[in-house]
């Protein structure tokens, strides 16, 4: 299921402190992505790897998304699982696109790729959060 308006959500699980904590973390992840995009817009040569590694820690992010996912019924989870895979893949690709040699400026094409990944991540987080609303 990919339509949040049709999502089946267990409200008791969603209201639990563990899932509410995960929900807040997912919102913070989306905010981090938005800040990275703004930083890259302001400075096309900005190295965002420290933020990716620290703020979007792969294992922690995956666990947080899966914790929030427990509030959704099985059919809904099929759609949200797909979004989780997209988010994790895009973070991996963003980290790869960010890599560059010292002293070599980032090319316009690489900048475009990174901005595209950040925009896609922002949308994916928004789409995922829509299931919890």
Give the role of each language-model region.
Residues 52-113, 117:
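Long, amphipathic, charge-rich alpha-helical segments that form helical bundles/coiled-coils
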Residues 14-72, 90:
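Alpha-helical segments in soluble extracytoplasmic regions
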Residues 19-25, 32-36, 90-133:
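C-terminal amphipathic alpha-helix
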